[in-house]
Amino acid sequence: VELAYDQLVSEGYIHSEPYRGYFACDVRELYDLTDIRSGEMKQKPFRTENNYGTAEAEGLHGKTGSNPKKQTSYEIDFSLNELSMDNFPYNGLSKIMKNLLLDHGKQIMSSGSAFGEKNLKETICDYLYHARNVRCTPEQIIIGAGNEYLQLMLIQMLGTSHGVAMESPTYLRAYRTFKNAGLSVREVALDDAGMRVDLLRKTDASIAYVMPSHQFPLGIVMPMKRRLELLNWAVEEPERYIIEDDYDSEFRYKGKPIPALQGIDRSGKVIYLGTFSKSIASSIRVSYMVLPEHLLERYQECCGFYACTVPNLMQQAICQFMQEGYFEKNLNRMRAIYKSKHDFMLAELKKYSWVREIMGENSGLHLLVEVDTDCSEQDVIEACTEQQIRVYGLSEYYISQNPKREYPILLLGYGGLTEEQIADGLQRIDGILAELKKYQPISVHKE
């Protein structure tokens, strides 16, 4: 029963009040199903009473994450991008690729569909429906080598006249992709429910880029009420769209995974982005995009002449990897491994008096830690770097407006570390902070 209540709270259907109990949030059916008549989409506004107001490393590791002039050898790197690959089914994937080349070599080596291979798209379609509640047909899925490529295809289709609203802090590679392509980017602040729709309305943006299931880097899960408010904003204008980046949504350690925003969209306003970079491996570089049906013809006209950037062999290998059960087994195994590391780091952090607050727990592959020190965030990072410990500061992920805060916040990833490395790294951070002489070194941990 308690788990059921926790799940409803996390999805925003109910809220708890101390010493009083649980109460239902005001979430109603806010819009009707879309009518498609004579090729035009009739949109009906939501009914609501209130409107509230590496390549991969560059995005995950902030503004200085991939500076070639600052190459440092680290003994322990609390990377936000590294995965645990010791238990990956290498033999299974190797067998699949070998058999594909032996049995279908000629077909594999030929050029495939520009939008991705049909059997892979059918497999992804089935997976997304059962795992993320994404509702689509295989024809709506576009395969590409990385989210950045798919974002560029979107820009080519939608045009550069659109303003893009982005959460701040955010995933910086997406920001740079939009900015360098010529779009005007409007940063929108977040509260504990995600992107503030009241501030979004004050911008001229017609596209909102959000991560509702696990916002990077803060780890916020957008509750249902805010999701509906965001959809309400989108249907008010015909050329408004929401780009839902569902990155990192597979790893949730308490309750069930939060369904995708696309699954509750009935007006064709959500463009869904997903990737295998966490669920399989970052080097796979295979992503997928789910377009609303009414955008397929426009995409064909604007981008249909591009060849698919994912080799046919890799597409067929991933398809069989999923169909033969390797993907699901590996994903379940990795959830257990990352949950163990998450719980271990959480327990270790709670031992230290310099840890004021821990945020972003129960999902993803990193934790946010507010540090009790008079030093600046940059001072802490540089002191750790001198001792060959790599940590990451939250300020690196803001687009421009970095709010002043009393205490620095560090992002500590655990995906690629062992428990021994986590414990050693935190103990060494403790010593580093003590050397900064802003607090007494710990000899006895907190009870």
Question: Each predicted region: which residue ranges?
Answer:
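Conserved active-site segment immediately N-terminal to the catalytic lysine
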Residues: 257-276, 297-298, 410
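A generic "structured core" feature
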Residues: 168, 172-177, 241, 252, ...
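Short, conserved active-site loop motifs that form the nucleotide-linked donor/cofactor pocket
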Residues: 141, 240, 270, 355-356, ...
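N-terminal basic, amphipathic alpha-helical segments
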Residues: 2-98, 304-311, 322, 332, ...
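PLP-dependent aminotransferase class I/II
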Residues: 270-351, 357-361
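Conserved core of the PLP fold type I
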Residues: 97-239, 250, 256-264, 338, ...
